[in-house]
């Protein structure tokens, strides 16, 4: 196997037992593909599919006027290039968008001859702005990065369920069905406790279902024929003869003696008819059975009975037979009657009873009844009734099942999946009711609504399309009204179309929808997880309050589709999920997961993606099944999942049809980063997966020594690490950019063969963490497409590195690690292991006020020169200035209203011309509790306002940087061109040239080197073809230079034009501060196994427990945190990390002793290739082996994949390899090498028992004490209660609540209590007085009436109760 440029620098030793057959798919594919399909920007118009924007346009257009004379047709659309790139949008606070323009055709027909076209106008119309997705799957909206989270909602289709006996006190199951369209009215069918079947539309008033059946044109006879089988009777003078159907009699009690055709009694009266009786009757050839009169009474007629002579209706279908009715029938000479066959077990009389409740006579009456239910109080005219009925379920404009809905309806009703319209059909309604009645009769199963075959994912593209369609339909209404005027007023299409509704719908969705979220950008993992999130909340989804336990629970169909571990703790648990590692969406929006095909117990290389519906048909084995070298399943019984319930059973290998592609396929990206996940309790694994997302990127990232092998995928797919777009040679590198000369075979003709990567330097993320990229390549390095060439935040050599590898000891230490506290060595802080940089953005705006414009200036009165020292002449702080709380960053003055002056002040002003007091100082200062270094300043100026010097210098720097990029590209393009020219010209004959080159002479290399390269074009070759080539190269270079000049001009224009600022703002200045945060007591830390704690003390190195060779521990954790939490994975990680560190030390010692490459290779082979995955070390050269060894000095990184990780014996083997006997003795290790004798740093004495010691990857979480620490002496008060505000953001006070008052009451501290409730809180006069007293040096208080008491009195008065206070 070939290693990439970065992989071979540090190979991760993997313990995986199973080879990967299927690579982890690109982790952001769902987001990016969905939005690409929505826009179809790159697809030529003719080849666009009917989805996304195209589908929305096709659905709304053509639009016809009310009189039908004018219509507007849609031709095509295109998206223009975005005016600003992503970075510029972030800086300026703009949306990264593209203008959507649609070409529409207005066709006007002749008024006299409507069939004839009078005129056609075609025009391109602006249709609003569509936000574009960045390359990493996010959106920049108003300058901030946002993510549109996918939504998991109930799929359109038909669903059958029951109420689980909760509705009625008897516990009877009430069955119901619901037809849910993608757009349109919901149709519900439900049984009531009396077994009458009702329907309701959009949860309105319920009505008997037969009304709906009559409204679609069925008569009562037809309704009964659809739902019942009939008994045929032939009437006789006394009683009747029943046509014998054997099955129908079984289980009934005979109400009379039943005889066969010979008159022999087979069943006596009052005996239950069993299978033997049926057989006897059958074998005797009984066709008819004589039944007495009372057997007929109470039965229900199946058809209308008409008098053969008169033609009048004697009895209606669904009438009960009575003695009178039977007499009438006999009199009319009716011989044959049909009745409904019903019984109590599996053929209930439900539809017959429902027909009795229904009072409507025919189709018209039924439709009027539905109209009255939908529009109560409106008079039902025939047209209105018809229009409403059609619009409910049969109109494509208002009702849409969608392809998914039609597929689901067809599969549930047992029809071929492709056929049927997108609106509801009569058969759909009838079939649904039939299945529902069958369910009530005990046949069939209800649906499981939590099954992933019944829930589908709506991605960004689909959500955006729905919004766009909503906006477009608003436009349609307006256009329809104005189309009538198009002919008379000679209007063009752009006069008719107003794009505002579209823009506002899109803006509202991206800006304030519940699914459009502020991107979590703490580290690369949190970014990628946010984009892979699936939420059941949001518009059209569930609400937190209504969601029960079942929806939140893990369902068997989640396997390989949705992660069972990663979900938030708290009210959203189970409603917000993460996609599993290999999951993807199919064309219908259902989640699919890959399985490897198994044929005759042998694994094949075919991988199929199955949705939850398809998977139910197959037997699927788990990835941990034993497989021999040829890929055969060797166990006698294999654990597999089968059936619709997906229950795990033991099956024989020949029955297995599929097998999982990888053990990690059931978990998400975050959970698959937890090593030894299989040894952790599920609750702690959940915390571990969630807390990795909160890890703050450290100043010096450190790859985890014990990983899972997925770290590189996450780092690369998140877009944090920079990948080479094309292979080539590194031409130039500095901290800001990398220039790569592209390989000839990858360069496209006529295009610059140069890739320039501008690295992100010290940029603020959404969570104020620092995003900074560092190059990893040197000039001359050969890189291939996809190689990592620069590390980003929290990445180390292209691998995700969220924390630091720490030497951890599990032991109590003087109570400092009680209750999950963490004891840290001073060395960790001194080495800046957990130091992180946070970037704060502070901004100030200068507005145009009523009294005059605010001004950003250095000239501020009443400020000492020392406070202005950091400001330049424009009044803006220098880059690099160290600032603390209260320092001025940007000087600003605001005009204030004229105040009344005393005569003395007037005199002074007249003498000295003092004008400064007309303005007040409103400068931007560093907020309290913050200090740092200014790293960047940006100045935005409104169009038409002259720029200050600082703003101009910022623009000049930006242009200089841009020019540098262009020069680099030009240099490489010219270099390539001249190299090609040199090859062409050497040894060619000429007709003349510069430096008196004689005719017929041959060009030499020396001659070309002697003259200026640009003079080569003056050479006149004898060969005309060569002369043409020379001219072509010259033109190509000039063309490129011209293009670059144009690009530079464009950039300059963009920078020098005025900035778009909010109304009333003249100038805006943004100052970026870099704040360095060291680890300190109160900071929250965690491992990857849900083992979290707070730093309690930072102890001097000399006091930390140390080993026999003097190595002190970095962190001391409490061993009691492990057993009750059951996250044993952390112990296994500690042991394996200890082995990794030991192996690194061994390699380091070999390099120190200058061992030969062959010796190093031997040790590496022992480490890498004696268990687990075999690495191809022979493919590396000696220098590469030594570079690899150099990178392994701090520890050999291990990969222990989830559910396929290192076993105990493998960990032991690694420990034995890392610590041979002499080293183990020197370090004081026990025989198992998993524990060590430690010594107390303060006394030097050995601890009583050996201590578990090893290396664990620990994270610093984004809950820093600096952000929470807060103190206040005086500050703002609430207006009404006059009590201090609360919270750090408001600079609030500490709440002295009810319980604290009880405490003081209990102690009898009455004076303390009095001042707490009065002068320290809301006694306005009292607190002013106290301040005066303190100033005077008197320490006494005079407590008055608290303001909140006055508020209480006012509230009581508002109830009409007057309270007067009498003072005694």
Swiss-Prot record:
Q: What is its EC number?
A: 2.7.7.6
What GO molecular function terms would the record report? DNA binding; DNA-directed RNA polymerase activity; ribonucleoside binding
Q: Which residues form a coiled coil?
A: none
An example of a Pfam family matching this protein is RNA_pol_Rpb2_3
**Which Gene3D superfamilies does the annotation name?**
2.40.50.100, 2.40.50.150, 3.90.1100.10, DNA-directed RNA polymerase, beta subunit, external 1 domain, DNA-directed RNA polymerase, subunit 2, domain 6, RNA polymerase alpha subunit dimerisation domain, RNA polymerase Rpb2, domain 2
**Keywords of the record:** DNA-directed RNA polymerase, Nucleotidyltransferase, Transcription, Transferase
List the catalysed reactions: RNA(n) + a ribonucleoside 5'-triphosphate = RNA(n+1) + diphosphate
GO biological process annotations for this chain's record? DNA-templated transcription
Gene Ontology cellular component terms for the protein in this record: DNA-directed RNA polymerase complex
Write down the top EC class of this protein: transferase
- Does this entry carry the keyword Cytoplasm? no
What the protein does comes down to: DNA-dependent RNA polymerase catalyzes the transcription of DNA into RNA using the four ribonucleoside triphosphates as substrates.
Fill in the subunit field for this protein. Answer: The RNAP catalytic core consists of 2 alpha, 1 beta, 1 beta' and 1 omega subunit. When a sigma factor is associated with the core the holoenzyme is formed, which can initiate transcription.
Q: Which PANTHER family match?
A: DNA-DIRECTED RNA POLYMERASE I SUBUNIT 2 (PTHR20856)
The similarity annotation says:
Belongs to the RNA polymerase beta chain family.
Q: What is this protein called?
A: DNA-directed RNA polymerase subunit beta
What species is this protein from?
A: Cupriavidus necator (strain ATCC 17699 / DSM 428 / KCTC 22496 / NCIMB 10442 / H16 / Stanier 337) (Ralstonia eutropha)
């Amino acid at each position: 196997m070939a290693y990439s440029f970065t992989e071979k620098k540090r190979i991760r030793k993997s313990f995986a037992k199973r080879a990967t057959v299927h690579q982890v798919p690109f982790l952001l594919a769902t987001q990016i593909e969905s939005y690409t399909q929505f826009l179809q920007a790159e697809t030529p118009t003719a080849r666009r599919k009917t989805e996304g924007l195209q589908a929305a346009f096709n659905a709304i257009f053509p639009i016809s006027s009310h009189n039908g004379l004018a219509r507007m047709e849609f031709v095509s659309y295109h998206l223009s290039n975005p005016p600003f790139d992503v970075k510029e949008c972030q800086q300026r606070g703009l949306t990264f968008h593209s203008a959507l323009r649609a070409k529409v055709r207005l066709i006007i027909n002749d008024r006299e001859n409507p069939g004839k076209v009078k005129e056609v106008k075609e025009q391109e119309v602006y249709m609003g702005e569509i936000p574009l997705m960045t390359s990493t799957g996010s959106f920049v909206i108003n300058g901030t990065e946002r993510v549109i989270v996918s939504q998991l909602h109930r799929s359109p289709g038909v669903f059958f369920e029951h109420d689980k006996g909760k509705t009625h006190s008897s516990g009877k199951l009430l069955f119901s069905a619901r037809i849910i369209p993608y757009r349109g009215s919901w149709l519900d069918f439900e049984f009531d406790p009396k077994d009458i079947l009702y329907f309701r539309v959009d949860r309105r008033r319920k009505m008997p279902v037969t009304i709906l059946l009559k409204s679609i044109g069925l008569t009562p006879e037809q309704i009964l024929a659809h739902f019942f089988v009939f008994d045929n009777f032939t009437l006789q003078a006394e009683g009747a003869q029943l046509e014998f159907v054997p099955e129908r009699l079984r289980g009934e009690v005979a109400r009379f003696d039943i005889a066969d055709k010979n008159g022999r009694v087979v069943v006596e009266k009052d005996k239950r008819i069993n299978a033997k009786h049926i057989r006897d009757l059958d074998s005797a050839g009984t066709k008819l059975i004589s039944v007495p009169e009372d057997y007929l009474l109470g039965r229900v007629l199946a058809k209308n009975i008409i008098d053969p002579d008169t033609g009048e209706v004697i009895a209606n279908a669904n009438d009960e037979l009575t003695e009178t009715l039977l007499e009438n029938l006999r009199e009319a000479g009716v011989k044959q009657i049909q009745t409904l066959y019903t019984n109590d077990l599996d053929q209930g009389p439900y539809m017959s009873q429902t027909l009795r409740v229904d009072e409507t006579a025919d189709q018209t009456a039924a439709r009027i009844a539905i109209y009255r239910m939908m529009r109560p109080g409106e008079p039902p005219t025939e047209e209105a009734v018809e229009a409403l009925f059609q619009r409910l379920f049969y109109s494509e404009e208002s009702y849409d099942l969608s392809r998914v809905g039609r597929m689901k309806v067809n599969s549930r009703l047992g029809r071929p999946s492709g056929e049927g319209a997108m609106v509801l059909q009569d058969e759909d309604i009838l079939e649904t009711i039939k299945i529902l009645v069958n369910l009530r009769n005990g046949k069939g199963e209800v649906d499981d609504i939590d099954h992933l075959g019944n829930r589908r994912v709506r991605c960004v593209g689909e959500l955006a399309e729905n919004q766009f369609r909503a906006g477009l339909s608003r436009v349609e209404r307006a256009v329809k009204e104005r189309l009538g005027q198009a002919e008379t007023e000679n209007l063009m299409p752009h006069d008719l179309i107003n794009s505002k509704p579209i823009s506002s719908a899109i803006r509202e969705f991206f800006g304030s929808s519940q699914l459009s979220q502020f991107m979590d950008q703490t580290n690369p993992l949190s970014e990628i997880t946010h984009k892979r999130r699936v939420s059941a909340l949001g518009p059209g989804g569930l609400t937190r309050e209504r969601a029960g336990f079942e929806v939140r629970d893990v369902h068997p169909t989640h396997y390989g589709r949705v992660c069972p571990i990663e979900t938030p703790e708290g009210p959203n648990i189970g409603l917000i999920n993460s996609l599993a590692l290999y999951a993807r969406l199919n064309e219908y929006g259902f989640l699919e997961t890959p399985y490897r095909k198994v044929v005759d117990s042998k694994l094949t290389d075919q991988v199929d993606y199955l949705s939850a519906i398809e998977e139910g048909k197959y037997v699927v084995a788990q990835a941990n099944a034993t497989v021999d070298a040829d890929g055969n399943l060797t166990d006698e019984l294999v654990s597999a999942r089968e059936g619709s319930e997906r229950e795990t059973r033991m099956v024989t290998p020949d029955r297995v049809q599929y097998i999982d592609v990888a053990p990690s396929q059931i978990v998400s990206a975050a959970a698959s980063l937890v090593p030894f996940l299989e040894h952790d309790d599920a609750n702690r694994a959940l915390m571990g997966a969630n807390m990795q997302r909160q890890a703050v990127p450290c100043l010096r990232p450190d790859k985890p020594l014990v990983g899972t092998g997925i770290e590189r995928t996450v780092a690369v797919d998140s877009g944090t690490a920079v990948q080479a777009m094309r292979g080539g040679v590194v031409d130039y590198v500095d901290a800001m950019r990398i220039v790569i000369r592209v390989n000839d075979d990858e360069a496209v003709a006529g295009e610059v063969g140069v890739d320039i990567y501008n690295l992100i330097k010290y940029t603020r993320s959404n969570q104020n963490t620092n995003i900074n990229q560092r190059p990893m390549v040197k000039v001359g390095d050969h890189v291939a497409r996809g190689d990592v060439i620069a590390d980003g935040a929290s990445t180390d050599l292209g691998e995700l590195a969220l924390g630091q590898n720490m030497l951890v000891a599990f032991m109590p230490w003087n109570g400092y690690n009680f209750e999950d506290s963490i004891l840290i060595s001073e060395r960790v802080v001194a080495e800046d292991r957990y130091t992180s940089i946070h970037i704060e953005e502070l901004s100030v705006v200068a507005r145009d006020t009523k009294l005059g414009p605010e001004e950003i200036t250095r000239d501020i009165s009443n400020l000492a020169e020392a406070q202005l020292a950091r400001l330049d002449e424009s009044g803006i702080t220098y880059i690099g200035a160290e600032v603390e709380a209260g320092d001025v960053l940007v000087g600003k003055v605001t005009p204030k209203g004229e105040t009344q002056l005393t005569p003395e002040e007037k005199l002074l002003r007249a003498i000295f011309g003092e004008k400064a007091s007309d303005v007040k100082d409103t400068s931007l200062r560093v907020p309290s509790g913050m200090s740092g270094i200014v790293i960047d300043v940006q100045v935005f100026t409104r169009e038409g306002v002259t720029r200050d010097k600082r703003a101009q210098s910022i623009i000049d720097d930006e242009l200089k940087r841009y020019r540098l990029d262009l020069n680099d590209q030009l240099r490489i393009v010219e270099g390539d061109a001249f190299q090609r020219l040199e090859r062409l010209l050497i040894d060619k004959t000429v007709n003349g040239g510069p430096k008196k080159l004689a005719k017929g002479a041959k060009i030499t290399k020396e001659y070309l080197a002697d003259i200026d390269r640009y003079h080569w074009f003056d050479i006149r070759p004898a060969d005309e073809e060569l002369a043409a080539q020379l001219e072509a190269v010259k033109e190509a270079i000039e063309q490129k230079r011209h293009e670059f000049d144009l690009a530079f001009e464009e950039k300059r224009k963009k920078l020098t034009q005025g900035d778009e600022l909010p109304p009333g703002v003249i100038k805006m200045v943004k100052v970026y501060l870099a704040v360095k945060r060291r680890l300190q007591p109160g900071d929250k830390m965690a491992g990857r196994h849900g083992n979290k704690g707070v730093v309690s003390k930072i102890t001097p190195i000399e006091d930390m427990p140390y080993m026999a060779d003097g190595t002190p521990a970095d962190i001391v954790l409490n061993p009691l945190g492990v057993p009750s939490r059951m996250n044993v994975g952390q112990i296994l990680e500690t042991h394996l990390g200890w082995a990794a560190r030991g192996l690194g030390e061994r390699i380091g010692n070999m390099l120190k002793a200058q061992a030969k490459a062959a010796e190093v290779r031997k040790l590496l082979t022992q480490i890498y290739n004696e268990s687990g995955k075999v690495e191809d070390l022979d493919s590396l050269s000696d220098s590469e082996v030594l570079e690899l060894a150099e990178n392994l000095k701090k520890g050999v990184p291990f990969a222990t994949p989830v559910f396929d990780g290192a076993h105990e014996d493998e960990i032991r083997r690694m420990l034995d390899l890392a610590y041979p006997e002499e080293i183990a003795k020197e370090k004081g290790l026990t025989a198992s090498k998993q524990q060590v004798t430690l010594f107390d740093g303060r006394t030097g004495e050995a601890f009583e028992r050996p201590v578990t010691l090893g290396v664990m990857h620990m994270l610093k979480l984004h809950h820093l004490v600096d952000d929470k620490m807060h103190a206040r002496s005086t500050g703002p008060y609430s207006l009404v209660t006059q009590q201090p505000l609360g919270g750090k953001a408001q600079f609030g006070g500490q709440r002295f609540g009810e319980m604290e008052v009880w405490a003081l009451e209990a102690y009898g501290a009455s004076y303390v209590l009095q001042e707490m409730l009065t002068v320290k809180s809301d006694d306005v006069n009292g607190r002013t007085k106290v301040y005066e007293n303190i100033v005077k040096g008197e320490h006494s208080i005079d407590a008055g009436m608290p303001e909140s008491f006055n508020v209480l009195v006012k509230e009581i008065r508002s109830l009409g109760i007057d309270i007067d206070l009498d003072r005694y």
